[in-house]
Each structure stands twice: as C-alpha cells, then as structure tokens.
Amino acid sequence: MDTIHRAEDAKEPAIQGYGLINEPVVPELSNVNETVGQCQRLMQRCTDEIRRYDRNHIVFVEHVAAVKDMSTGENLWNKYPIDELWFLIDDDNAVYEAHFYTPAVFTHQSAGDSVEYPKPCYVDNYLEYWVGCMSARQTSQDTYYESDYFTAGEDYNLYAPVLHSSKLGSGTALFDDVTVTEYAPDGTSGVVWHNDFSDGSQKPENAWNSDGTGSWSMSEGYLKISGGTDDYVLTFDKLKLREGCKYKISGHMQTVGAPSGGFADIRADFSLAENVYESGREYVFAELSEIVRFGKENNVPIYFGEFGADAESFKNGLGGERWVADVMDFCNENGISYSYHAYHEPMFGFYPEDTVKYPQHRNEALAKVFADKNRNG
C-alpha cells in the first residue's frame, strides 16, 4: 500500500505501473473457462483495490501461465493453447502481459546440453506423434545398412532418425555414420542429416526404454547402446519431409555379445504435425504471433514482461544472440514493448555474475544485439 501511495503522489517517477501476479498458476477446475475465470476475478479485485488509491498508473495483467492438477499437485504449463488462457479485466489503463521462453529446451538448457538455435526443424501441434517407421536393411557390405525410399504421405509429414535395440542383454550395439539422403524431383540428391558421433555434439533428443534397463554413450567414434532386456530407443532431430522428395536412411551397425534374439536397427520414425517450420525465425515469429493475437482482436496493448535465454545458450556458438535478435525483431516490427530477463543474475543475466558482486563482466554477444536492434530506438 505504501508503494501505491508513493506512486500516486508522483514521488517515485520510475514507477510505470503495477504487475499484479507474476506467472499465475491456478487450480484446474472442470473446464478451461472456470479455471481461467478464477484468475480473472482475482486480477479484477486487485485492480479495483489499487484504483481506490491510484487511477493514474498502469496495471499489468498477465494471462494464466499454468494450471495445477489438484490430484497430483503438478503444474501443467502447456495443457491449453495460449488463446484460451487470456482474459480481459474492466479497466481502461491495463496492459496485458506475456512471457516468452520458447523453445524452452533451448532457453533453459544446462551445461553440456548443447542445444543449438536454430535447429533444422521446429514443430507446432503434433497430431500424431508416432505413425510408423522404416528400418534400414543389411546390404552386401557386412555392417552397412540402407533403407528403401520413403516420402511424405497423408498420414505423416515429419521423420526422425532413430537408433533402436532390443534384448541386448549384456551385449552392445555400435552405430556409426548414420545418414539421411534427400532425392529431389530434378534428380539431384544431397545429405540432409549426418552423425558420425565423433565429437558428441549431436545428441539424441529423447531416450526411451520399455522397462528401465539399458544405456547409451558416445566414444571411440561410435554411439553405443549397452544392455537392456527389452526395447531401447534413441530419437534424434525431427525433420520435414518435403513434398516431391524421396529419402533414404543408412549407416553402419553391428552388435557385440548380444544373445540369440537380441538385435538393433537404424530406422526413420514418422510423425504428423499441424505446422512444421524449417526456420527458427519463422517458428519464433509464428509463436509470438499467437501470443499477440489477443491484443489485436481486443484492441488492447500487449507487453512482453520477460523474455530471455540462459547463459549456456550464448556459449560455443549455440545461438543465444540469434534467438534474442529474432524476438526483438518481431517486437520492433509489431510495436510491442518488452523487457529482457534479466539484468544481473547468474543464470539469465546480461551481467551473469553472482548478485552479491557488483556487475562487471557483461554478456558481450547480448550487448551487441541490444545495440544493433535498438539503434533507432
């Protein structure tokens, strides 16, 4: 209340307005309207109380960030599409706030994750995560396997290189030089994905096992799957199946010490998605457009109160500065105000030191983006 009085008296001109609730998480009720309605009513009550003392300053109203499953206590961050999580309040000096950290696997990576931006492909709204697969078959060369052609179909428009083993027991499967070749309608061809596992930089996006056994590693120029009493599956990047093109997946593979019935294979797994983007910038722009559509439809201002990428994403050429530049380009081109998260903190900071220290060593790649994108600001 003291802050409200001081802002109303204009004694603290740095106060732009009041952020009501940061990233609100609400209990999940019987439907999304009831769930979001809880947050809307609370935000309205907060605003009404503020307006008893201050009618001049902005109130910043953030959409529902997540819903809590009350039976498990789990916060569900992606259960509902963004356009179902917005709401309006009755106030003529409100700004509607969103935060942006998409793709989270990039912006929130840990040391060693090595997630790059951009990737070859981004997916929005899976319709069928797994439709089927095609395995490479052994050729006349002892350890070399190659699949038949596969193409885009009505049931799938994506594929992912996959390494699979089953019932290895105490044995090991070795994989090397896994390659996807694209054959264009004009007769030309080229490699669109390759992994020789020499430096460990291209890691699987997902590791799955059916019974909790098995493990994988990269060493000596191989990817190795070891042990496992049932299926063990490593899935790499999702890639778009381009219309009119044909594809083959190939690579070297052998099993060592596997019991009878144990085997491994190289394959392509197929998925169906509503939207597939082959440009990181195109993907980011599409995701941001979904967020700001609420403002355009309701003629209210949108503000990105937070966006940022952690310190790891700026190392070793992973592309943190490219992601920030794309977000800032969208905001600048669409007249959206924004705040970068954060100024001074170890994980996301423009000055990424411990906050007990005076900020000295800034993120120079980030500083250059700020200077370039705000040169005319």
Identify the residue ranges that each predicted region occupies.
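Active-site beta->alpha N-cap acidic-glycine motif
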Residues: 1-3, 46
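Extracellular glycoside hydrolase catalytic/binding regions
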Residues: 9-14, 24-133, 141, 269-334, ...
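Short, solvent-exposed turn/loop segments enriched in Gly/Ser/Thr/Pro and often Arg
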Residues: 21-22, 63-65, 340-347
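Extracellular and organelle-lumenal recognition/adhesion modules and their flexible linkers in secreted
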Residues: 127-278
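Aromatic-rich peripheral "rim/lid" segments of glycoside hydrolase catalytic domains that contact
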Residues: 132-133, 179, 216, 272, ...
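Residue-level detector of anion-binding/catalytic polar loops
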Residues: 246, 301, 337
